[in-house]
Amino acid sequence: MDDIRKIERLAAASWPAYFQKSIGKWLLRANFGVTKRANSVWTSADMPEGDFQLEAELFYQSLGLPVCFHISNASPKGLDDALADSRYEKVDECFQMTALCRSIMSRTNDNSRFTYKWEQEPSSVWIDEFIQLEGFSPERHKGYKHIFERMPPCKTFFKMYDKESLTALGTVSVIDGYGGLSNIVVAEEHRGKGAGTQVIRVLTEWAKNNGAERMFLQVMKENLAAVSLYGKIGFSPISEHHYRIKR
């Protein structure tokens, strides 16, 4: 359980919201509605005193956001059932996966046809290209900018090209010996050609060179292709989480 709590803590630290408010050891997080992770109650710690549900509902309602709880294997027992009884809907079941850096490097091969660009802080162009590849609304730019600015300082925002064609993007931040992967997206026309594996390899190498021994990421359970890819290159699930949203 200690390892699970650590991963959940690092995952929260690597994806910080614009607004964060403590409620005991939990965190109320809000980020203009961009990503559930940054707009949910982080609950991977002991239960707070008082009426946490009312406090959360007042917090999110005051911001005009859905009331959402992040429930993991490290959350207090009985919390998920209590929220279900209060008509909170279960959505977005995910794995937290981890791998040793050396395992990833030994299971992947460098592909020299790709070229790379790196940014310590993401430019507006990087954010726009990420949003475009993901197929998201341009209105999400501000929300992502706030998250990316607040990530731990040891981080990089990466672009990969095949010749001059933008192929993929990704981000890694290093904290407490772990590299947290996020924002990995491959352009549709380049999928199925090894680009995803190469992004993870290159970002893992960067993280390893900046003090990481292990990597972690989160992935939707229903994304079977991604779960399979991550498993082949050394990742295995350490924890599961989902969200409960007030309907």
UniProtKB/Swiss-Prot annotation:
Gene3D superfamilies: 3.40.630.30. Pfam families: Rv0428c_C. One of its GO terms (molecular function) is acyltransferase activity, transferring groups other than amino-acyl groups. Residues 102-247 form the N-acetyltransferase domain. PROSITE patterns: GNAT. Coiled coil: none annotated. Keywords: Acyltransferase, Transferase. Belongs to the acetyltransferase family. This is Uncharacterized N-acetyltransferase YobR. It comes from Bacillus subtilis (strain 168). The lineage of its organism: Bacteria, Bacillati, Bacillota, Bacilli, Bacillales.
